[in-house]
């Protein structure tokens, strides 16, 4: 007499064993057309399955929040099936779902091209039209192993050997005659997998180990209906338009090349942006009473061992040898700042010491993870470390929060999300110290009227931290700012100060970053603004274009006038149509285009137009310069409107 419990909390009692089809007809017959899967006790079941014992049943239709992942799991193995149909000798390593889609890793004798993606996509569409049922079977370890050995699928055999006990059953899904290892619940029928798109090809090491073979990864996206798919593809199209790599190349801001992977060659225009950002942070450092320092790029490996960084991050640290000594190319600035603190005796009267650096850091990131300015091997961190007493912690955290919001307000991001990461299981320090420290951080957030989310167990082993996440206009989140308490590093590196009782005391270190990596922040800004940076950050702020040769003398006069007041200006005296020039400089994202013809020359005025296409008409030159200077000096995010 099985008792069937349903996801909505209801239940039904049957006098005898009952098939899932019968249960559906009794409970919710209308769902049959849109039913994509059934979960019995959290496991996939076929419609013809008979239930003989008490069970918990969930019907998953296309409106169910679980439907999307089920469809994506199915599409991942549909892709694997299509690959084997087209290239029988290709070896499927693994497939799975990711945010917004799915992927499949394959070992194939040649590089897969964009044309191949079209071929695979068409094959997948053809398979979907067959509307075949997907079957799930539980078989023995030895049977599963034999199936994949016969198909020469060495990666599947390896996965079974490493992850499944020889006495256990193996769950396989069958797409017609193609068998694959269960990666997640799949649809009953492939007809529910109509709305997908293959997107790109990447490279990944087998098991993420660089000593293993490099595989080719095919990425795709899948959705429950055409509207959602189209919406996502439009979103991706917008992302592509804003891609900082394309915009950076078009605007000649920087480039990267194979001979120096993950390292940036800044061109003049890009370096102007970099320096303007750095100078802006410098203004804030002075305002909040920081001292700027510079520490060496190479520091003996011994220091990194003492600090604990070597044991935790050695795979990401570049090293070099000189005169039988091994040096680390610094991946972060903190140990160097501690050396400055330790270089002379400190009294409690000297504290707090706020030490900031635009430190050039190097990290050996995997080549497959490198991505323009967003993920590099050499970056500049707007890093600071505050050495203070335990009693000064709250005040310093409060000032850090104010400084971060002060600086972020200039860039008008959609939203700033705040997360407080608390103690992990493995940690140093007493519970009372952690209680006090976490309360310090939460109280300061509350005092500043900031809503925040707890990230339980996500703090570092040496202290809790606050993360500041910028949400852009496309709803992407970028973690940039951090405030991190550290009880560990000053102990490891023997830092101390003399307190009022003439005793040695260990200071607390507060790690503080605002932009994080300057390079990455520039990438974020370029994408947020589609390259239309605010005037104060724009490499060229004004361009003067001549209409005829007659006005070229006045153009040169204006060029000098603007240059003399440090406005970044170019002039265009080419013998081209005025419409062509305006379009070209608009595409170059120059904030203001000044048009100079006979009328302007004779009246000693200028016609002004901004890059949005707003025409200000003919105005007085000095008046425009004054307004432009105000926009630049105040670091206004928006252009003048009149």
Curated annotation (Swiss-Prot):
Molecular function GO labels: ATP binding; metal ion binding; threonine-tRNA ligase activity; tRNA binding
Top enzyme category: ligase
EC number: 6.1.1.3
Gene Ontology terms describing biological process: threonyl-tRNA aminoacylation
Compartments (UniProt record): Cytoplasm
Annotated spans, Catalytic: 243-534
Top-rank taxon: Bacteria
KW Manganese (keyword) present: no
UniProt binding sites for Zn(2+): 334, 385, 511
Coarse class of the protein's main subcellular location: cytoplasm
The keyword RNA-binding belongs to this UniProt entry's keyword annotation: yes
CC per GO annotation: cytosol
Cofactor annotation: Zn(2+)
Cofactor note: Binds 1 zinc ion per subunit.
Classification via Pfam families: HGTP_anticodon (PF03129), tRNA-synt_2b (PF00587), tRNA_SAD (PF07973)
Keywords: Aminoacyl-tRNA synthetase, ATP-binding, Cytoplasm, Ligase, Metal-binding, Nucleotide-binding, Protein biosynthesis, RNA-binding, tRNA-binding, Zinc
Stored Gene3D superfamilies: 3.10.20.30, 3.30.54.20, Anticodon-binding domain, Bira Bifunctional Protein, Domain 2, Threonyl-trna Synthetase, Chain A, domain 2
Transmembrane segments: none
PROSITE patterns: AA_TRNA_LIGASE_II (PS50862), TGS (PS51880)
Residue ranges of domain TGS in the record: 1-61
Family recorded in the similarity comment: Belongs to the class-II aminoacyl-tRNA synthetase family.
Complex and partners: Homodimer.
Chain's role: Catalyzes the attachment of threonine to tRNA(Thr) in a two-step reaction: L-threonine is first activated by ATP to form Thr-AMP and then transferred to the acceptor end of tRNA(Thr). Also edits incorrectly charged L-seryl-tRNA(Thr).
Listed HAMAP family: Thr_tRNA_synth (MF_00184)
Protein name as catalogued: Threonine--tRNA ligase
Organism expressing this protein natively: Buchnera aphidicola subsp. Acyrthosiphon pisum (strain APS)
């Amino acid at each position: 007499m099985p008792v069937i419990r349903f996801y909505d909390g209801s239940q039904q009692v049957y006098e005898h064993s009952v098939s899932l089809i019968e249960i559906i007809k009794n409970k919710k017959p209308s769902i049959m057309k849109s039913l994509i899967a059934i979960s019995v006790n959290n496991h996939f079941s076929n419609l013809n399955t008979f239930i003989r014992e008490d069970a918990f049943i969930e019907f998953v239709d296309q409106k169910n929040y679980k439907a999307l992942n089920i469809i994506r799991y199915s599409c991942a193995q549909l892709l694997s099936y299509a690959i084997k149909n087209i290239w029988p000798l290709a070896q499927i390593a693994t497939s799975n779902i990711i945010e917004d889609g799915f992927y499949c890793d394959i070992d194939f004798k040649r590089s897969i091209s964009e044309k191949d993606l079209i071929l695979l996509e068409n094959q997948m569409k053809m398979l979907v039209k067959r509307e075949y049922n997907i079957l799930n079977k539980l078989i023995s370890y030895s049977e599963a192993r034999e199936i994949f050995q016969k198909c020469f699928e060495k990666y599947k055999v390896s996965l079974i050997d490493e992850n499944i006990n020889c006495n256990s059953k193996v769950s396989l899904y069958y797409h017609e005659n193609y068998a694959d290892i269960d990666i997640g619940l799949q649809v009953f029928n492939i007809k529910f997998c109509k709305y997908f798109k293959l997107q790109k090809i990447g490279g990944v090491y087998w098991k993420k180990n660089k000593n293993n073979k490099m595989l080719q990864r095919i990425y795709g996206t899948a959705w429950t209906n055409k509207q959602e798919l189209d919406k996502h593809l439009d979103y991706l199209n917008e992302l592509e338009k804003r891609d900082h790599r394309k915009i950076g190349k078009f605007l000649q801001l920087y480039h990267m090349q194979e001979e120096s992977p993950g390292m940036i060659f800044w061109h003049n225009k890009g370096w102007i942006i970099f320096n303007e950002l750095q100078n802006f942070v410098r203004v804030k450092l002075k305002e909040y009473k920081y001292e700027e320092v510079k520490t060496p790029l190479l520091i003996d490996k011994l220091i990194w061992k003492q600090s604990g960084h070597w044991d935790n991050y050695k795979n990401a640290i570049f090293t070099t040898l000189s005169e039988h000594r091994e040096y680390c190319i610094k991946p972060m600035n903190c140990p160097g700042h501690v050396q400055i603190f330790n270089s002379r005796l400190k009294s409690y009267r000297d504290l707090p010491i706020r030490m900031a650096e635009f430190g050039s850091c190097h990290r050996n990131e995997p080549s497959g993870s490198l991505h323009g300015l967003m993920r590099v091997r050499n970056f500049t961190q707007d890093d600071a470390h505050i050495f203070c007493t335990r009693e000064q912690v709250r005040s310093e955290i409060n000032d850090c929060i104010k400084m971060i919001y002060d600086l972020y307000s200039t860039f008008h991001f959609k939203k700033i999300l705040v997360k407080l990461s608390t103690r992990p299981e493995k940690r140093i320090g007493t519970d009372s110290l952690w209680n006090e420290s976490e309360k310090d951080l939460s109280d300061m957030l509350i005092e500043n009227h900031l809503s925040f989310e707890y990230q339980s167990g996500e703090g570092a082993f040496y202290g809790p931290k606050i993360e500041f996440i910028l949400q852009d206009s496309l709803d992407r989140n970028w973690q940039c700012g951090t405030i991190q308490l550290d009880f560990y590093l000053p102990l490891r590196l023997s830092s101390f100060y003399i307190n009022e009782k003439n005793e040695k005391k260990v200071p607390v270190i507060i790690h503080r970053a605002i932009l994080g990596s300057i390079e990455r922040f520039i990438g974020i800004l370029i994408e947020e603004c589609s390259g239309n940076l605010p005037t104060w950050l724009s490499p060229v702020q004004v361009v003067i274009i001549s209409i005829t040769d007659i006005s070229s003398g006045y153009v040169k006069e204006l060029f000098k006038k603007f240059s003399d007041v440090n406005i970044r200006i170019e002039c265009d005296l080419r013998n081209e149509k005025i419409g062509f020039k305006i379009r070209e400089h608009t595409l170059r994202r120059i904030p203001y285009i000044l048009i100079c013809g006979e009328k302007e020359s004779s009246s000693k005025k200028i016609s002004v137009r901004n890059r949005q296409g707003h025409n200000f008409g003919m105005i007085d030159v000095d008046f425009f310069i004054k307004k432009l200077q105000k926009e630049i000096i105040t670091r206004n995010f928006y252009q003048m409107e009149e």
